[in-house]
Amino acid sequence: MPAESRIRFGYWMPVFGGWLRNVEDEGMEASWDYVSKLARRSEQIGYDLSLIAELNLNDIKGVDAPSLDAWSTSAALAAVTQSLELMVAVRPTFHSPALFAKQAANIDHISKGRLALNVVSSWWEQEARMYGADFERHDDRYGRTAEWLDVLDGVWTQRTFSHAGKYYRTEGTVLEPKPVRLPRPPIYAGGESEAAKNLIAQKCDAYVMHGDSPARVAAKVADMRERRDRFGLGRMRFGVSGYAFTRDSEREVARELERITDVKQNAKGYANYQQWLQGTQLEQAMSIQEYSVSNRGLRSGLIGTPAQIQEQVGRFEEAGVDLLLLQFSPQLEEMERFSEGVIRRR
């Protein structure tokens, strides 16, 4: 595992062909050729981890746009990378837990112990209907997720495992080989409702947050640590998302910010954004400008000159953040620039 004394730099793999809802062509296609090239290069320039989102439809560019499957992509990336941790999203409503545990354990072996999970309770009703998955009320999703995690943990850690619950049933399940990382690959999850936060504090290893200021993130970290203590469990890790770019002058920063936040409510991703708002419970309302960038990324304040971003990264470290999950556009070019101006100067 990487040293815990240094904040780690991760990035979202562009499986949707971009992160900007108002820029139609971001110069980074949703293709295996692009993501494999990006992953291999990212290892060389200082990135530690990549988050691979799981959606069967494209919520950024519109439902008709291409999107890559998370788990077949992650298996292929595991075989062509050497050091990059692969945090792959998984929605329990789309995966039987015991079968999924078998597949994930195999990918952990392909990667030689570099797999991590990002467990996500489904929010997109249209996608669920299209793909024949159950779509439950908000808190019911977390009941399913809790039981799903119990089965996952059981088959990964026990020689044989049986379970009879509300959602899942297994009888004497044997899973070999076990994952490389013991007792299991790290489990990350995010959420802002009470049901989500209590579940994560009790059953997960790390809490990931949408973009927000260091001050608000610090309060969330303190809250989750308190919840964790109530369950008598050990240290959690914390990650936060952010949209990032660096320029040499504040004038150039302002110009790029204007380009990416040029609001178009008729963009194909706008309807998907509205469905996401209806399917989640947020602690803070979003502005229409923030809609332009995925995952509330602008709130993290990771745009500016290299010196300004260095200062903001330091504030996140002080807030208790272990991992930044960054989005860029166009991805490869901006990741190179960010590495040169920020990562390699730390």
Give residue ranges: language-model regions.
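An alpha-helical appendage that flanks or caps ligand/catalytic pockets
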Residues: 2-5, 11-15, 44, 131, ...
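Conserved, mostly hydrophobic/aromatic
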Residues: 9, 42, 46, 77, ...
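Hydrophobic faces of well-ordered beta-strands that scaffold small-molecule active sites
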Residues: 9-11, 50-52, 86-90, 115-119, ...
